[in-house]
Amino acid sequence: MSQVELLNQTLTLQRFPPMPEETPLQAWEAADEYLLQQVEQPSGPVLIFNDSFGALACALAEVRPVSVNDSFIAHQATRHNLRLNDIDDSLVTMQDSLSPLPDAPELVLMKIPKQLALLEQQLRALRKVVTPQTRIIAGAKARDIHTSTLTLFEKILGPTTTTLAWKKARLIHCAFSAPALADAPETLSWKLDGTPWTIHNHASVFSRTSLDIGARFFMQHLPEAVEGEMVDLGCGNGVIGLTLLAQNPQAKVRFVDESYMAVASSRLNVETNLPEAMERCEFQVNNALTGVEPESFHAVLCNPPFHQQHAITDHIAWQMFQDARRCLKWGGELRIVGNRHLDYFRKLKKIFGNCTTVATNNKFVVLKAVKLRKSR
């Protein structure tokens, strides 16, 4: 938690979920400051995109902006920091990236997302609502703005220029001119090898163009003949949960992710590939298993992320593991896949008191930890 001066306001900002105090990671970056230096008090609608921890929303709360993000955690972070600064969180409207945008914004401020596909989806959504009078400004670390980034802005919206770097950040200014543009499909689809399934992926889903190799390995080592409720935690496009449904015809599966597009992709993939299993499914956008009742599940399956936005961190994996233990029934298991170098074995042993290796190859390991009662 630390303070920053933004738009003549001293704001206290904290990363979310909260991290240890000794972390060097901050809840804002130079691109946030650089973007806000361009802002004169707007009188019309303001759209903010990809505001990871709410720095832009907190600074602009008085003009009642709409904050658009695919991340549920980013929305939670924004609410957290608004309250931390005694700002009424109802001043900022939170919206996911799949919902229609408000018409004719006066100002658009965008933090450029990590995935080029998500940037394209957001620019195409903006194209439907901006006008030639809309000020469109995007920002990021200078190293994250590439020729492909500028090409997308010009192709979808119109003439684009960049600024000089400031504190290693750079801005993009774009003027809307409605260039001719072919339609693009809402999802990218591909056949999943070894199955009859076609997998559909919204723009921000991890490994959107093919099955990632960790998930492919994990699919070979999932539990079978489970009759209770299981969770695909951090579900992405839902291929793990889809496999669980097929291998466990008596089980229910809850698909959970902090990405709105991931949960939408999971729902679409069950609807189109195993429609008869929809009654055994639940779909939830959440920060891990926050708010879920203890002792709810027979098994939790997880391919935990080891980064948040551009930062490498293991605190999300820790939260997933701890939430899983709380929400598992006694005798229930957490089964995960991870890169071998991440040492998840030690973490699970610390949380559960036990851990066994289910399978391993030269890059990944599948681990199992069981929620056991302490022996007296």
Curated annotation (Swiss-Prot):
First-level EC class: transferase
Signal sequence region: none
Catalyzed reactions: guanosine(1835) in 23S rRNA + S-adenosyl-L-methionine = N(2)-methylguanosine(1835) in 23S rRNA + S-adenosyl-L-homocysteine + H(+)
A molecular function (GO) term: 23S rRNA (guanine(1835)-N(2))-methyltransferase activity
Enzyme Commission number(s) of this protein: 2.1.1.174
CDD domains: AdoMet_MTases
InterPro entries, alphabetized: DNA_methylase_N6_adenine_CS (IPR002052), rRNA_m2G-MeTrfase_RlmG (IPR017237), RsmC/RlmG (IPR046977), SAM-dependent_MTases_sf (IPR029063), Small_mtfrase_dom (IPR007848)
Cellular component, GO annotation: cytoplasm
Main location: cytoplasm
Role: Specifically methylates the guanine in position 1835 (m2G1835) of 23S rRNA.
Sequence similarity: Belongs to the methyltransferase superfamily. RlmG family.
UniProt name for this protein: Ribosomal RNA large subunit methyltransferase G
Organism: Cronobacter sakazakii (strain ATCC BAA-894) (Enterobacter sakazakii)
Organism taxonomic ancestry: Bacteria, Pseudomonadati, Pseudomonadota, Gammaproteobacteria, Enterobacterales
Gene responsible for this protein: rlmG
